[in-house]
Amino acid sequence: MPLKLSLKPGEKFVLNGAVVQNGDRRGVLVLQNKASVLREKDIMQLDEATTPARRIYFPVMMMYLDEANAERQYEEFATRLTEFMGVVRNPDVLTDCIAISKHVMAREHYKALMLSRKLIEYEDQRLGHVS
């Protein structure tokens, strides 16, 4: 099933490791086969991984963008997720953590990545950060 991306003017995204930028008009991109695609708004730089939830998100993002080298990021992911789960008491968040781990183990990195965003939202609410 093709993936259809509607792009804003100038919007950047990563496609199989390459940074691509849309032109000066709205555009539509249709991917006919499996590819790693991540929109600019979902891309995190290493120096932005400054909180426990973001330190989970970052290695998951790297696993998604570079599946061939996912094992390099796995140890960091497992350590950070274990630390996070050790201090969180919210059962819904813990359920999300387990689901993220299962997705990573199944190499479903995009699903794990999108669920990891929920951890960041939870953390921001608890810490009073404004997104």
Curated annotation (Swiss-Prot):
HAMAP family in the cross-refs: FlbT (MF_00783)
Organism superkingdom: Bacteria
Functional note: Has a post-transcriptional repressor function in flagellum biogenesis. Associates with the 5'-UTR of fljK mRNA and promotes its degradation.
Protein family according to the UniProt entry: Belongs to the FlbT family.
Alphabetically ordered keywords of this record: Bacterial flagellum biogenesis, Repressor, RNA-binding
Coiled-coil stretches: none
Gene designation: flbT
Name of the protein in question: Probable flagellum biosynthesis repressor protein FlbT
Pfam families in the record: FlbT (PF07378)
NCBIfam families hit by this protein: PRK00794.1-1
Record GO biological process: bacterial-type flagellum organization; mRNA catabolic process; negative regulation of bacterial-type flagellum assembly
MF terms in GO: mRNA 5'-UTR binding
